[in-house]
Structure formats: structure tokens, C-alpha cells
């Protein structure tokens, strides 16, 4: 039976740390296993994405799509977040709710190109909302609760998106 004071790691499973650069007699003196001069001999150097001459992963993967320069950046808000803010007393359900009110209540962080209303969650309060755009489910939920939803998105663009 093995005793606790006789426990030891398996033979060959541990290795002492090698202190490099401690004289020629140590076997790892002078250049400390880094070879002679050059970029890789210097401290703090590792070339990001370099895989030793093998084609790097970011170049092996195919390119796809593009980033539109005219992309709009909307603050997206779900119905449950608005309901939560009303319950917490941060928003007044009787007052008109727009991007500025949502920002002040901390529901959104910023509204660069406007607010888009999404339909997740249940709306219990009768609200008067003014947003840039809204999904069909969000619009239906606001109207079902007896509220009013006004969108500031240009009408021509709204009609085109409804047809698509």
C-alpha cells in the first residue's frame, strides 16, 4: 500500500526548467537557443499570422461579400425592453416615446441612424411610439395593445421593402 509521504510523480513526467544565457558551460549560454541575430533572435517578436512559410489561415479562407459604405446603423429595440423600462419607472407610458426618450431611459446606448422596433416580447401598455422603422410583428403588437406607432422612414423606401 502506498503512503501519502511516498507519493511522487511518474518517472520522466517532470522536467526542470532550463535557465538560459548563463555562460558557455551550461549548454544554453550566449545566444540562449535563439540562433544568431535576426528578427527571431530579438525579444518580444512573434509575427502575427505567420505560420513558418505555410499559407496562413486567413489567406486560405475564401473572401466573401463586402461592407457597404452606405450601411445604416440602427439601434434595435425589442418590445420587452420597452415594457421592462416602463415597469422600472424609467419610461412614462403616457408620454410620447421616441429615440431621445429611449436614450435618456438607458434602453439604447446611441441612435446614430434611428431606432428600429423589433417584435420580441409582449406589450401590455398603450404606447405612443415614434421610431425610424418597425417590423410587422412589432407594429401589430403596438396596435393590439391600443397604442400608436409612427415611423419616420421615407414612404417610398417603406413601400419597396414591403413588396420585396
Swiss-Prot record:
It holds the Pfam family Ribosomal_L27A. Residues 1-49, 143-164 are annotated as: Disordered. Residues 22-36 have a biased composition (Gly residues). One of its GO terms (biological process) is translation. GO terms for molecular function: rRNA binding; structural constituent of ribosome. Transmembrane segments: none annotated. Keywords: Ribonucleoprotein, Ribosomal protein, RNA-binding, rRNA-binding. It comes from the Bacteria. PROSITE patterns: RIBOSOMAL_L15. GO terms for cellular component: cytosolic large ribosomal subunit. Belongs to the universal ribosomal protein uL15 family. Part of the 50S ribosomal subunit. HAMAP family: Ribosomal_uL15 (MF_01341). Binds to the 23S rRNA. This is Large ribosomal subunit protein uL15. It comes from Phenylobacterium zucineum (strain HLK1). The lineage of its organism: Bacteria, Pseudomonadati, Pseudomonadota, Alphaproteobacteria, Caulobacterales.
